[in-house]
Amino acid sequence: MINTALVSFGMSGKVFHAPFIAANPNFNLVGSWERSTKNIVATYPGTKSYNSYEELLADSNIDLVVVNSPNDSHFAYVKSALLAGKHVVCEKAFTNTSAEAQELDELANKKGLKLAVYQNRRYDADFLTIQKLISEGEIGDFLDVQISFERYRTTLSPKKHKESVTPGAGLLYDLGPH
């Protein structure tokens, strides 16, 4: 049983992480750090709402931390979790620079910990269909690929971390990894 905690119980925690962790018999959803509301306890009775990230990391019951916070915080949260001896799954975009990614990879290896990047579109039907057609020999070698993934909004997102002009923000970091 892998005791797991989320860094956030916002949209990605509620939709992409908690339901799958709770449904898998190999995982135990222990709780989440929630800066404002305490929704995880209401949604998943028996879980804990941590008051700080430090409190979450200090919990010796936690084996795995899912870092699902704004992109610009990933490096610091992942590094802190690894230094605390926790395995980590981090949402895309993993880090803002390749140097940060390399540092985290080296730290995880040095400490004998697992570090993985979560990419939620990996098993979407379009990608699985292409993979199947290639493996069955239905289509040959690719010379060029164009994939379109769009998001249209008439207004900027109220989530400042997605629309601001800062490292880790904007469409390239938000949608580019898909």
Predicted features along the sequence, with ranges:
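N-terminal Rossmann-like dinucleotide-binding module
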Residues: 1-44
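Nucleotide donor/acceptor-binding cores
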Residues: 2, 113, 140-143
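Acidic-histidine catalytic/liganding microenvironments
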Residues: 24, 44, 59-60, 124
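Short, Asp-centered acidic motifs that coordinate Mg2+ and/or phosphate
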Residues: 31, 63-64, 144
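Short, conserved SAM-binding/catalytic segment
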Residues: 41-47, 103-108
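Short acidic-hydrophobic, aromatic-tinged amphipathic segments that line or gate anion-handling sites
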Residues: 48-52
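Beta-strand-loop-alpha-helix segment that lines the small-molecule cofactor/substrate pocket
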Residues: 64, 70-71, 75-122
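Predominantly a Rossmann-like dinucleotide-binding segment in NAD(P)-dependent oxidoreductases
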Residues: 122-178
